[in-house]
Amino acid sequence: MNLKDANILEEYIIKDIETGDDELDAFLFSLGCYSGEPITVISHLKGGCVVSIKDARYNIDNDLAEAISI
């Protein structure tokens, strides 16, 4: 299951991130988005979704939402 399939306002644990880009993986890690970390989808948008990680909110696109397994 990935973030695009997640229910709104339900907390999940990140299982894996498969972006295929080491630089993007490092950026996500710096935001606190890595395996074992809780993540909550705040809302689904046409082009992506808004997520909450470590009390911060981020807008991510659909491609990235599909790369984050929960």
Where are these regions (language model features)?
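A structural micro-motif recognizing beta-strand termini
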Residues: I17-T19, S30
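Intrinsically disordered, low-complexity, charged/polar segments
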Residues: N2-D5, E66
